C-alpha cells in the first residue's frame, strides 16, 4: 500500500517514512543508501530530494511496482536514484557496494518475507555497510506485551551483528506499548550515541529535511530494556515469523 498527495508529491502521506531520517541524525549524512522495498517510493524520493549528494539504490522484487511508482507516484528518473527489479537479499549477495545506510521497508502487517529477518541476512547487511553505517528497519509490532514477540525476536537476532540498537515507535497520539504500530529500528556497529545527543542532532536536521517533528520523533525513543529470553533467534533454518505474527493477531 502507498499514497501520495497530488499537490505535493514529496509531502509525507505515511508518517513512519519520516522516521528514517533519524538514521542521519545517528550516523551522519549518507553518501550511498540502499532501500529494500519501493512501494510508492515515498522514502527514496524524499531522500533523493533532501540529500543532493546521495546515490540511492532501490531493490524492489516486483517490476510492476517499479512501473507504477514511476508512472503514478512521480519517482524521479534520475541517475542518483537507481531502481532494480530484484529481491533485496539477492541484490546484496550480488553487490560489491558498501552503503552508509540500508533501509529495510519490505514488511507488511500480516506478511513478512522471513529471509529478510534472519541472522544470515543481518550478517550480509553488516558486510555491505560502512563501519559507521546504519541499518534501518520498519516493522509492525508492539514494544511490550503479548503482541511484541516479532519485534523482540528481531532485536535478539540483530544483537549478534549490531551491538547498538535504537527503537522509535510511531506513537500517533497514544503511548500504549502493547498496541501494534510501526516501529523504526536503527542498528549500528559504531559507538553508541547518547539519547540527548541524538535528540539535539535530530532538532538541527529537521528543518533541513522538511520534517519539523524530527526532534519529537527522536525524543519518543523506546528506552526500556527489551526482554528477549523467551523469543527465538531467527535463522535461515528456523525463522517462525508466521507463528510470531499469529501470536500477535496479525494472521
Sequence positions of predicted segments:
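Acidic/histidine-rich, surface-exposed loop or edge segments in extracytoplasmic proteins
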Residues: 1-5, 135-138
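Soluble small-group transferase modules, centered on the S-adenosyl donor enzyme superfamily
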Residues: 1-3, 168-251
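Generic detection of intrinsically disordered/low-complexity segments and helix-coil linkers/edges
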Residues: 10, 66-67, 156, 211, ...
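Residue-identity detector for threonine
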Residues: 12, 17, 24, 29, ...
Amino acid at each position: 500500500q502507498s499514497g501520495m498527495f497530488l499537490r505535493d508529491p514529496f509531502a509525507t502521506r505515511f508518517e513512519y517514512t519520516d522516521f528514517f531520517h533519524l538514521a542521519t541524525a545517528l550516523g551522519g549524512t549518507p553518501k550511498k543508501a540502499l532501500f529494500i522495498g519501493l512501494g510508492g517510493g515515498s522514502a527514496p524520493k524524499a531522500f533523493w530530494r533532501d540529500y543532493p549528494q546521495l546515490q540511492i539504490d532501490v531493490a524492489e522484487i516486483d517490476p510492476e511496482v517499479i512501473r507504477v511508482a514511476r508512472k503514478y507516484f512521480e519517482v524521479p528518473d534520475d541517475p542518483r536514484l537507481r531502481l532494480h527489479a530484484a529481491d533485496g537479499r539477492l541484490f546484496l549477495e550480488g553487490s560489491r557496494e558498501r552503503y552508509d545506510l540500508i533501509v529495510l521497508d519490505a514488511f507488511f502487517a500480516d506478511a513478512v518475507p522471513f529471509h529478510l529477518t534472519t541472522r544470515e541476512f543481518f550478517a550480509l547487511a553488516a558486510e555491505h555497510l560502512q563501519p559507521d553505517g546504519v541499518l534501518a528497519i520498519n516493522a509492525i509490532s508492539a514494544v511490550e506485551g503479548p503482541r511484541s514477540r516479532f519485534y523482540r525476536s528481531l532485536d535478539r537476532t540483530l544483537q549478534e551483528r549490531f551491538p547498538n540498537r535504537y527503537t522509535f515507535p510511531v506513537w500517533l497520539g497514544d503511548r500504549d506499548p502493547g498496541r501494534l504500530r510501526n516501529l523504526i529500528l536503527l542498528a549500528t556497529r559504531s559507538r553508541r550515541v547518547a539519547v540527548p545527543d541524538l535528540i539535539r542532532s535530530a532538532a538541527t536536521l529537521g528543518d533541513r529535511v522538511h520534517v519539523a517533528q524530527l526532534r519529537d520523533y527522536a525524543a519518543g525513543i523506546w528506552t526500556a530494556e527489551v526482554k528477549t529470553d523467551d523469543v527465538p533467534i531467527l535463522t535461515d533454518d528456523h525463522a517462525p515469523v508466521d507463528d510470531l505474527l499469529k501470536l500477535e493477531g496479525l494472521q
